[in-house]
Regions:
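Nucleotide-sugar-dependent glycosyltransferase catalytic domains
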Residues: 1-176, 182-204
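Short beta->alpha connector loops at strand-helix junctions that form conserved
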Residues: 2-9, 76-78, 248, 265-270, ...
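Short acidic active-site motifs
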Residues: 40, 232-233, 295, 299
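A donor-sugar binding/catalytic signature common to diverse glycosyltransferases
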Residues: 53-55, 229-277
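Catalytic donor nucleotide-activated moiety binding site of glycosyltransferases and closely related
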Residues: 183, 193-227
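C-terminal "capping" alpha-helix adjacent to the active site of nucleotide-linked donor transferases
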Residues: 282, 286, 291-308
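A short, well-ordered alpha-helix in the C-terminal region of glycosyltransferases
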Residues: 308-322
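C-terminal alpha-helical cap of glycosyltransferases
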Residues: 323-330
């Protein structure tokens, strides 16, 4: 283990606003972290002389260090595998495209800085994309990976690694709806209020996880059929849920599919949008077209009452069982 916290550059104060939304900021962070840890980590690696370096696809500096030291590299990918073909799935708004174009001079300047330090990076997409010559572990099934036929046999699709808790044994008297926007961009009080307004009069129960930074007292009167809490054991809840309104993070979607729970899709970032589109393609959920209470209610009831969504989710979940990963029970 190489402790690196003391060598990490400070995180930008506005990181919540930029995470997943600003490509130039991602390149900035990558270059800053790579160069800040360079002497420490490269020194340790040269002393250890490892036979292989395994690094998360988001920890791009792992790939850069391996390439610089000419050490075999294995990429561990917790999202979809990403190449030039699947990049087309990352649909961007006009404002996002303009922001990317305006950031290109800054991105190119940072790439030149990397090259001055001996990292042979020509184009920014080399930092982000998986290539067909690199051994890559992908924690989803080949059935759920978009355009899986475009990836070489260097890619191993293991399925998600899920530690399944024992069922609670609780018997439900009516359907259970689970709502969560994840752990990052979850301070959305107006949306939570709309959810309560949408479902307070329906004959169902709702668990809504709002994150530790949301002031629950500021949401007003909590309906009797709602549990509004900062965080939950998501795997326990999904074992009993009938519909999941989700931000479409890869982990959340994988867990939902594993338990055969259909979804209402409310992505917050571009990569979550790609996950949402794939869920819709396989028939396991529908996009939420708006934030109004009436739209939320209609979307959730549509998924709840139409069995084909649960059947589709269960089909993808069954494919996880046939993948190479083992599922752990705790």
């Amino acid at each position: 283990c190489i402790p690196c916290d003391d060598f990490m550059p400070p995180a930008p104060k506005d990181i919540d606003k930029k995470v997943g939304r600003d490509l130039s900021s991602l390149v900035d962070m990558t270059v800053d972290v790579t160069l800040a840890m360079e002497d420490k980590v490269l020194g340790e690696l040269r002393a250890w002389k490892p036979d292989c370096i395994v690094s998360d696809s988001i920890c791009i500096w792992g790939k850069l260090y391996a390439k610089k030291l000419n050490v075999p590299f294995v990429c561990s990918t917790t999202t979809f595998a990403f190449n030039q073909q699947t990049a087309r799935l990352m649909k961007q708004s006009l404002s996002e495209l303009l922001r990317m174009l305006s950031g290109m001079p800054r991105i190119n300047a940072r790439l030149r800085q990397l090259r001055r330090h001996g990292y042979e990076i020509r184009q920014f997409y080399e930092l982000l994309q998986n290539d067909n010559d690199t051994e890559t572990i992908v924690y989803t099934s080949k059935e759920f990976q978009p355009m899986s036929e475009t990836f070489s046999d260097k890619f191993t699709f293991t399925g998600p690694s899920i530690a399944v808790p024992k069922p609670s044994g609780h018997k439900k008297s009516r359907p259970l709806i689970y709502i969560s926007l994840g752990t990052v961009l979850n301070r959305q009080e107006d949306f939570y209020i709309s959810c309560m307004k949408a479902l307070k009069s329906e004959a169902l129960d709702v668990i809504m996880s709002v994150g530790g930074r949301t002031d629950i007292s500021g949401l007003g009167v909590i309906p009797d059929n709602f549990q509004v809490i900062p965080r939950v054991n998501q795997l326990e809840v999904l074992q009993e849920a009938d519909v999941f309104l989700t931000h479409c993070g890869m982990n959340s979607v994988s867990e939902s599919l594993y338990f055969g729970v259909p979804m209402v899709l409310f992505p917050q970032q571009p990569e979550e949008g790609a996950v949402a589109r794939r869920v819709q393609e396989v028939g396991a959920g529908i996009p939420l077209p708006g934030r109004e209470a009436s739209v939320i209610r209609e979307s959730i009831l549509q998924v709840l009452k139409n069995a084909r969504f649960r059947v589709a989710a269960g089909g993808i979940g069954a494919a996880y069982f046939s993948s190479k990963a083992s599922i752990c029970f705790s």
